[in-house]
């Protein structure tokens, strides 16, 4: 995903 986008379904590490 895009570096932990602000999407709550995006579980990638990110800010």
Swiss-Prot record:
On the 2D-gel the determined MW of this unknown protein is: 70 kDa. This is Unknown 70 kDa protein.
């Amino acid at each position: 995903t895009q570096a932990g986008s602000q999407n709550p379904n995006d579980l990638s590490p990110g800010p």
